[in-house]
């Protein structure tokens, strides 16, 4: 299966994430706490917690911080109880946006999210207005040059759903959300190291933006991601910023 080029967008996204690394620990602690509260403290039986722990390890979070977050989630330590919220809306050129939050104050969060949309040329929509365009899935990206046939065989054997070759030569392995960590581990054991990967909400129909529109859309995404209560921002926009 062929796909269009995502390599430049992936590299740009990683650069933005690195620039915001100071907020990553806070978001990971929230996610670990909620995952442990919802599914228990055993990552072997809790795919959401397993994914959060993978991200914590990738970002070199101290083990004491991780364990404390798990203990707060399971009730072994007292902690804040976070509410999960999802907001939907539209950005530049009608591009769809989904914003996932963890908060202890719903009133504050919706006001902050609405302000970020309004100030940056977007519109906060109603529940379900864009969700139909997104699918929940995991992905792993491998650099151009990896043998596609061998990677495909290893990935499908590990439980992947699909393998996509992009126009730029990078290869993307698609998984079910709960299978992502297992497929990643199996491929690493087989010698395949991904350069990017996550469990995400992926748009089925994308909106290409370039020039000023792309810059404005990036500003809107950044404003949302900068909010303390926001965990993840998903969009149908493909930004051509060069």
Swiss-Prot record:
UniProtKB keywords: Cytoplasm, DNA-binding, Transcription, Transcription regulation
Species assigned in the record: Neisseria gonorrhoeae (strain ATCC 700825 / FA 1090)
GO biological process: regulation of DNA-templated transcription
Disulfide bonds: none
Chief place where the protein resides: cytoplasm
Record protein name field: Probable transcriptional regulatory protein NGO_1291
Compartments where found: Cytoplasm
GO annotations of cellular component type: cytosol
């Amino acid at each position: 299966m062929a796909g269009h080029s995502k390599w430049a967008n992936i590299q740009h996204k990683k650069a933005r994430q690195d620039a915001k690394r100071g907020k990553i620990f806070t978001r990971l602690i929230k996610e670990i706490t909620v995952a442990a509260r919802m599914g228990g403290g055993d990552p072997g039986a809790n795919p959401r917690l397993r994914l959060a722990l993978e991200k914590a390890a990738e970002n070199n979070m101290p083990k004491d911080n991780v364990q404390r977050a798990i203990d707060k989630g399971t009730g072994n330590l007292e902690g804040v109880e976070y509410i999960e919220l999802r907001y939907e809306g539209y950005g530049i050129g009608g591009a769809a946006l989904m914003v996932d939050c963890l908060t202890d104050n719903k009133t504050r969060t919706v006001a902050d999210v609405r302000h970020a949309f309004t100030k940056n040329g977007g519109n906060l929509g109603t529940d379900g207005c864009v969700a139909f365009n997104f699918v929940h899935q995991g992905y792993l990206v491998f650099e151009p040059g990896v043998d596609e046939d061998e990677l495909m065989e290893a990935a499908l054997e590990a439980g992947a759903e699909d393998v996509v070759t992009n126009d730029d030569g990078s290869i993307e392995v698609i998984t079910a959300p709960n299978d992502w960590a297992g497929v990643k581990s199996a491929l690493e054991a087989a010698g395949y190291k991904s350069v990017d990967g996550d469990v995400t909400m992926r748009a089925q129909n994308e909106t290409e933006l370039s020039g000023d529109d792309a810059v404005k859309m990036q500003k809107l995404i950044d404003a949302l991601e900068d909010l303390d209560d926001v965990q993840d921002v998903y969009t149908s926009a493909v930004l051509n910023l060069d």
